[in-house]
């Protein structure tokens, strides 16, 4: 179930402040964040976020198609190595 429309989209205040500061100065640097729950706003376009996946910060470059999604959607937390192979068929 999605978020109520009357509440509007959510993004952490510290994240918005960092993006506004970088937009004013015109700098491009990686913004480290643990806020996977924040919605991507149009102001975030062109910036690279280091989204924490529980172990490291995954670089996520924000494009126009990502607006409206959450930052955590683009930094997977689980690594799938495949199912174990059947040892009987190897003989």
Swiss-Prot record:
Gene Ontology biological process terms in this record: ribosomal small subunit assembly; translation
UniProt organism field: Exiguobacterium sp. (strain ATCC BAA-1283 / AT1b)
Annotated family: Belongs to the universal ribosomal protein uS19 family.
Entries under Gene3D superfamilies matching the protein: 30s Ribosomal Protein S19, Chain A
Superkingdom, taxonomy of origin: Bacteria
Matches recorded under InterPro entries: Ribosomal_uS19, Ribosomal_uS19_bac-type, Ribosomal_uS19_CS, Ribosomal_uS19_SF
Keyword terms: Ribonucleoprotein, Ribosomal protein, RNA-binding, rRNA-binding
The protein's name in its UniProt record: Small ribosomal subunit protein uS19
A Pfam family annotated for this UniProt entry: Ribosomal_S19
Function: Protein S19 forms a complex with S13 that binds strongly to the 16S ribosomal RNA.
Gene Ontology molecular function terms on file: rRNA binding; structural constituent of ribosome
GO cellular component, one term: cytoplasm
Signal peptide: none
């Amino acid at each position: 179930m999605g978020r109520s429309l009357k509440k509007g989209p959510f993004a952490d205040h510290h994240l918005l402040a960092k993006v506004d500061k970088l937009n004013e100065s015109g700098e491009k640097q990686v913004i480290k964040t643990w806020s996977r729950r924040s919605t991507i706003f149009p102001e975030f376009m062109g910036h690279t976020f280091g989204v924490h996946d529980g172990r490291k910060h995954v670089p996520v470059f924000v494009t126009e198609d990502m607006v409206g999604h959450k930052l955590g959607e683009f930094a997977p937390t689980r690594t799938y190595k495949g199912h174990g192979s059947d040892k009987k068929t190897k003989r």
